Design a protein with these regions (language model features):
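Glycine-rich, N-terminal phosphate-binding loop of Rossmann-like dinucleotide-binding domains
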Residues: 93-94
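A Trp-anchored, charged/polar loop motif used as the substrate-binding/catalytic surface
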Residues: 72-74
């Protein structure tokens, strides 16, 4: 059993991810509604060091084509905030919302940014358990249809329900499931595909180059206007 556990938290709803992290760590830290930088949180749970990385959200039913490039890069680079790498990815899914085909495709595309091997490290975290009413989670998965079932299958049928209104409830059970993921993966943490890393590096360099070009263009335009007397330099 690993004494330290490292996890990256993914999902399309900021509040839900923050609640899951607070539940695990026993904190009451509010998360910014919109953020594009991954945030590292640490805590001690039953004598074990827990590191959780909260990542930027994507829109629930949007393709990666509609997600900002900076958000996609932050998702992929989030694994570097918990070196040497996360043991598990916690995919947060709100039970109060219908799970559509678009939602499934969006999840598959955004997790696909990490490479195919991510699926052997994913646990689905279901929140808003009050929405189950008299259903069991197994009945809910069945009733939601093929799209949710496909995600569960790709995750190796690993899932956990969190009553985020009751702090600490279900945390110990989740840690046992995370230990199970570590065991299944022979104690190895997740490592990003080299091809994906090169792709991210290339896109980041392209973004930096475009930003540099824009800055140069603005500076040149300002100098031209200053020479013409249309603007005055700030003192």
């Amino acid at each position: 059993m690993e004494h330290e556990l490292r996890a990256v938290v993914l999902g399309c709803r900021t509040a839900e991810k923050a609640s899951v992290i607070n539940n695990i760590l026993g904190d009451e830290v509010e998360s910014d509604r919109f953020f594009v930088k991954s945030v590292r949180r640490e805590g001690d749970v039953n004598g074990r060091k827990i590191t959780l990385i909260n990542t930027p959200c994507w829109w629930k039913e949007y393709s990666t084509k509609d997600t900002r490039e900076v958000v996609k890069q932050e998702l992929v680079c989030s694994v570097f905030l918990c070196p040497p790498g996360p043991h598990v990815f916690l995919l947060v899914v709100d039970l109060s919302l219908p799970f559509t085909q678009e939602h499934r495709i969006s999840i598959e595309e955004h997790l696909g940014l990490f490479g195919e091997r991510i699926w052997s490290h994913v646990i689905v975290i279901f929140t808003r358990t009050v929405s189950l009413k008299d259903e069991s989670i197994e009945q809910h998965i069945q009733n939601q249809g093929e799209d949710l079932q496909q995600i569960i299958q790709r995750c190796g049928h690993r899932y956990h329900i969190f009553d985020i209104d009751n702090k600490g409830n279900g945390v110990e059970e989740l840690l046992v499931k995370i230990d199970g993921v570590v065991t299944v993966n022979n104690g190895k943490h997740f490592e990003t595909d080299d091809e994906k890393l090169l792709e991210v590096k290339k896109k980041r360099e392209e973004i930096q180059e475009r930003a540099k070009d824009r800055q140069t263009m603005v500076q040149e335009k300002t100098e031209q206007l200053t020479e013409k007397g249309d603007v005055f330099p700030l003192r």
